[in-house]
Amino acid sequence: MRAKIISVVANNFYVHLYDLKIQIKAIPKGIFKHNSHELKPMVGDDVEVELIGNTYLITKIYERYNQLIRPKVANIDIVLIVVSIVQPDLNTLSLNKYLAFYEARNIKNVLIGLSKYDLANNHLKQKINKLILDYKKNNYAVFILTKENDILLLKEKIKSKTLCLAGNSGVGKSTLINKLDPSIQQRTQEISHFLNRGKHTTTSTKLISFANGFLVDTPGFGNLEVNLTKNEMANAFNDFANYARFCKFSNCLHIEEPECAIKKAVDEKLIVNRYDDYLKIIKELPNDVLKIKTRAQNRKCK
């Protein structure tokens, strides 16, 4: 039977059986414990489960199409990064870091959700509307979470998917969750625990049934650290992709290298909105590794 691992507690694995639509406890077959060359089961894995006697055994792990280390989860279909426009103010540098990180981790659908749009003044809304157009030009789907039509579109987008929700506390994640799947209110205790984990338990990951699929929550922006190399960052900005292949050097970082197609595109105004942020991010890299701590940043859109 095919199943998905939804939780790991100590050595106990809890899986969702797709056909029966039930959740049961399973034990990994010994090969996963004793063979260092075998994948180790993790939350999000699609697995094969066999009932032997009274025990469900995990006998096979299907190939992963992506995975994160923190939170430790595999096979994410969609990441929705929720950022507020005000209270707290929108931080575009942090947003761009996270977009780059998830792109680098082979997550194909990275969405942007803007909350508290209705609290912005007209001047700020004009700035935000221009920003939305810029991100859409770079093939990012942007949803204004206070607009009912955008919520309907988002519901359709995430249906039957494994959704990873990222965002700092106070940006409206719990409100959004209730909008996307009102039935979640029937599991109040579960979702409350899910969204309010202490700082020492942020590496513990759990999937819950959500919108005919699954939901995994990440720690807030200020708590989540991710490492990227300079080359990973250079390849993670999707608006660079059409130009980077024309750079003279295959490992071009698009900073001071000669015959850099990205710098040429910037000079010709073909890339206009994120290159400055890219340079700021690259300059932060100590010893070729970026540790993202977004609370250290203070760039706001006003």
Swiss-Prot record:
Positions of disulphide bridges: none
Annotated localization: Cytoplasm
Annotated transmembrane regions: none
This protein's GO CC annotations: cytoplasm
EC category: hydrolase
Record's cofactor remark: Binds 1 zinc ion per subunit.
Family listed: Belongs to the TRAFAC class YlqF/YawG GTPase family. RsgA subfamily.
Name listed for the protein in its UniProt record: Small ribosomal subunit biogenesis GTPase RsgA
Biological source species: Ureaplasma parvum serovar 3 (strain ATCC 700970)
Taxonomic path: Bacteria, Bacillati, Mycoplasmatota, Mycoplasmoidales, Mycoplasmoidaceae
